[in-house]
């Protein structure tokens, strides 16, 4: 009897493997970082062979650490950095170019050309996404246009495309399976999220041959099994979701109106909107959350560019902190920020402002402002930005949030989580297992093979470590938010456009 489920968590800076038991608890973890490649300013690449090598090595390491055989693993779930684009030769299995990472801005000009052709609204209506270099479509076009011989080989049917999940499955099955799931397909900018198919009009606009594209399947589904030479015997590959969608599933946000926020370098907020795709009027993305039980659920997504990175800035550039956890001690040493607001718009502002020309600002300084006030204001900025995104979600969906579920590094900061609850006016729930991304992938994989019976079965595993109840009067909350919005205004449109 298989006792465990394995999650492969392929992130932007490292590959991890976590093995979970039936209660959703961690049995074993292995992690390996890999190289970031920056060929030019604004360009970011990874070596696809290194992605595969690190991911395979951590899987074998996690099994060895816990003394687990392949026969004891019920299934494998995969969660991955989204949008990152790989094109390879299906005859040799070798990439024709490095993986172009989601952060890479090299295709901004292709996006401008599509805007000039009047495709902004078409893309928005069909894919739920804003026209941006972030997504995979323009990255595929760039590889076909710029790698010698790539377009000819693609047109002959020899080259295939995949996001990172697809690349891992191809390698795990030794080239037998070319597949992705709904959540990853919905981040390519060439997938119609309403009709659930690759979109011919968008493929034509980007000049991408349809033969390159993987088959799209539900997020909880047996896609194939690992080649038996890899782990000693074959294991079903049965769950796939992009990292943020996997975290939404792992946080048990299975009902319409439930939401989670991941506090990492940036912050990612997703709200489950059920079986309807809500079009945003506030600059949020409409995306597929997951496909499970023969139905597709949608989500609204908002991203905050600078979250935990603002605390790293205090530590590394300003040298105000020895380590990030120390920020909590300083922030709680004062009663408030003494009127100081910090807007961390270091690279512009994301949702709902979308101002690339905004820059970081500190306002409200007086002679009485201290280091403690400054650190507290920086922490508070994460909560204010989260409020802005959730408020936009409420306006778009008409759904009032009942509670916010949190994960990621900065969710361990009790001061920040309490302030978040105060500013939102709803409880903030931090679960016992904060590795929710890997957990979500494990749940999707376990459900597909009957390791867990149904969503109710996995929901029983979800346990709250701590709930932060709002404890601020409405007038004070409104006063603080008014100050924040005034500060944001002053940071906007600072950098001159070229």
Curated annotation (Swiss-Prot):
GO terms for cellular component: cytosol. Sn-glycerol 3-phosphate binds at residues 12, 82-83, 134, 243. GO terms for molecular function: ATP binding; glycerol kinase activity. Transmembrane segments: none annotated. It is an enzyme of class 2 (transferase). It catalyses: glycerol + ATP = sn-glycerol 3-phosphate + ADP + H(+). The keyword DNA damage does not apply. ADP binds at residues 12, 16, 265, 308, 409, 413. It comes from the Bacteria. ATP binds at residues 12-14, 265, 308, 312, 409. Pathway: Polyol metabolism; glycerol degradation via glycerol kinase pathway; sn-glycerol 3-phosphate from glycerol: step 1/1. Keywords: ATP-binding, Glycerol metabolism, Kinase, Nucleotide-binding, Transferase. It holds the Pfam family FGGY_N. Its EC number is 2.7.1.30. Activated by phosphorylation and inhibited by fructose 1,6-bisphosphate (FBP). GO terms for biological process: glycerol catabolic process; glycerol metabolic process; glycerol-3-phosphate metabolic process. PROSITE patterns: FGGY_KINASES_1 (PS00933), FGGY_KINASES_2 (PS00445). Glycerol binds at residues 82-83, 134, 243-244. Key enzyme in the regulation of glycerol uptake and metabolism. Catalyzes the phosphorylation of glycerol to yield sn-glycerol 3-phosphate. HAMAP family: Glycerol_kin (MF_00186). Belongs to the FGGY kinase family. Homotetramer and homodimer (in equilibrium). This is Glycerol kinase 1. It comes from Clostridium tetani (strain Massachusetts / E88). The gene is glpK1.
């Amino acid at each position: 009897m298989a006792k465990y489920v394995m999650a492969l968590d392929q992130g932007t800076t490292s590959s991890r493997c976590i093995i979970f038991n039936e209660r959703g608890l961690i049995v074993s973890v292995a992690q390996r970082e890999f190289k970031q490649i920056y060929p030019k300013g604004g360009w970011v690449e990874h070596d696809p062979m290194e992605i595969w090598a690190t991911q395979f090595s951590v899987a074998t390491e996690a099994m060895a650490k816990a003394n687990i055989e392949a026969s004891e693993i019920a299934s494998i779930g995969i969660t991955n950095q989204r949008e990152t684009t790989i094109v390879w030769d299906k005859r040799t299995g070798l990439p024709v170019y490095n993986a172009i990472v989601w952060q890479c801005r090299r295709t901004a000009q292709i996006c401008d050309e599509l805007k000039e052709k009047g495709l902004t609204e078409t893309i928005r209506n069909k894919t739920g996404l804003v026209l941006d270099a972030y997504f995979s479509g323009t990255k595929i076009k760039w590889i076909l246009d710029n790698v010698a011989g790539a377009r000819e080989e693609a047109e002959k049917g020899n080259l295939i495309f995949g996001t990172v999940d697809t690349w891992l499955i191809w390698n795990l099955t030794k080239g037998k399976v070319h597949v992705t799931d709904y959540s990853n397909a919905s981040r390519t900018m060439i997938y119609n999220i309403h009709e659930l198919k690759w979109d011919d009009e968008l493929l034509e606009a980007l000049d991408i041959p349809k033969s390159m594209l993987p088959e799209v399947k539900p997020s909880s589904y047996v896609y194939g099994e690992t080649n038996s030479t890899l782990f000693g015997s074959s294991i079903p590959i049965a769950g796939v979701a992009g990292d943020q969608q996997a975290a939404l599933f792992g946080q048990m946000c299975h009902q319409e109106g439930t939401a989670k926020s991941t506090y990492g370098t940036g912050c990612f907020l997703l709200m489950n909107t059920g079986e309807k795709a809500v079009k945003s009027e506030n600059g949020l993305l409409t995306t597929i959350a997951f496909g499970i039980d023969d139905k597709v659920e949608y989500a609204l997504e908002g991203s905050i560019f600078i979250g935990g990175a603002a605390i790293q800035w205090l530590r590394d550039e300003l040298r105000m902190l020895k380590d990030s956890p120390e920020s909590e001690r300083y922030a709680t040493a004062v009663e408030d920020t003494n009127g100081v607001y910090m807007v961390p718009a270091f690279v512009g502002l994301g949702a709902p402002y979308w101002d690339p020309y905004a820059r970081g600002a500190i306002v409200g300084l007086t002679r009485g402002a201290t280091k403690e006030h400054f650190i507290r204001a920086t922490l508070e900025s994460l909560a204010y930005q989260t409020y802005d995104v959730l408020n936009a979600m409420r306006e778009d969906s008409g759904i009032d949030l009942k509670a916010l579920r949190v994960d990621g590094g900065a969710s361990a900061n009790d001061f920040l989580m309490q302030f978040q609850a105060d500013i939102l006016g709803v409880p903030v729930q931090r679960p016992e297992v904060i590795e929710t991304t890997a957990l979500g992938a494990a749940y999707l994989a376990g459900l597909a093979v009957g390791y867990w019976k149904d969503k109710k079965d996995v929901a029983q595993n979800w346990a709250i470590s701590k709930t932060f109840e709002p404890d601020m009067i409405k007038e004070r909350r409104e006063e603080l938010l008014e100050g924040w919005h005034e500060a944001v205004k002053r940071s906007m449109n600072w950098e001159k456009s070229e």
